[in-house]
Amino acid sequence: MGEFWIKGPKAFELVQKLTTNDVAALIDGKVQYSCFPNDKGGIVDDLLVYRFSAEKYLLVVNAANIEKDWAWCTKWAKELGMNVDTDLENASDNICQLAVQGPLALKAMQKLTTANVVDMEYYTFQEIPFAGIDKVIFSTTGYTGAGGCEIYAYVKDAEKLWHAVFEAGAEFGIKPAGLGARDTLRLEAGFCLYGHEIDDDHSPIEAGLGWITKFVPGNDFINRAYHEKLKADKPTRYMKPFELQDKGIARQGYVIEDAEGNEIGVVCSGTVSPWTGKSIGTGYVKSGFHKLDTEIFIRVRNKALKAKIVKTPFF
């Protein structure tokens, strides 16, 4: 992941400008899911916002987008008259993140600290001594839908952290999981992935992220008027989850059709869910085909596979 520190008297103003969610609703020790809107109606990236104080925030962005996200943040910091050399810090090369997920994660991790982590609320964080490391950021967040935590430490402590976590988790059956497993889990949970469900060309309103796009007084985020109008006028396309009724797997870029074979959308993500054994996916469909239980068809090579719009999570 990428980690950016935003500090100083204009920190709140910058983060509020950069993100669609309402940063004013955050208090110290809380985390907020949000996104960076661009200036043409799409999304630069999605991220987590950590509030340490009114003048100190940590933004956690996608690793693949670090360079462009940093350029975007510094551009707007300069617009606000901030000193990008002292008020902003790209700490991505110095910080590592280890995600420990699942219903037993907090119980297992409690063995590694004297701080109370097992009773932490969802989307909160603490700076605590952990696994013999003086200080980590322990965050009850994750990208799997299974609960658990994400632990941020300095890169120099990464190997020590890894071994300690696996030793503590051994009695609970802990196992390593890579990006492929994470992608399957996030899709089953109905979470967006940048470059799939969200990108530079789709609004958070179209992507089903209206819940993190707050049109409240004082939340003057970038291009707010565009998204507010889009919400009022109703989008012409919606990102929706679907479940295949016929045998096959939907993949990103596959065409979505109606019963007459007319193109009505495109697949964002698809896989066979290990949890349910069903073939699942997400895609953008034209307005009118986005309602629950609507029948759609996925064009897989020369076949049109029947599917229907469903709810998330898929499990």
In which residue ranges do the predicted regions lie?
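Short, surface-exposed helix-loop/turn micro-motifs enriched in polar/charged residues
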Residues: 3, 25-28, 176-179
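A common structural microfeature
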Residues: 1-3, 12, 46, 56
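Conserved, structured C-terminal
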Residues: 52-315
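Internal amphipathic helical hairpin motif
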Residues: 9-43, 105-135
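Short, glycine/charge-rich beta-strand/loop segments that flank catalytic centers
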Residues: 1-2, 29-40, 88-98
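Conserved phosphate/anionic-ligand binding catalytic regions in large, soluble enzymes, centered on
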Residues: 1-7, 142-147
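Well-ordered mid-protein domain cores that form the structural environment of catalytic cofactors
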Residues: 21-55, 60-76
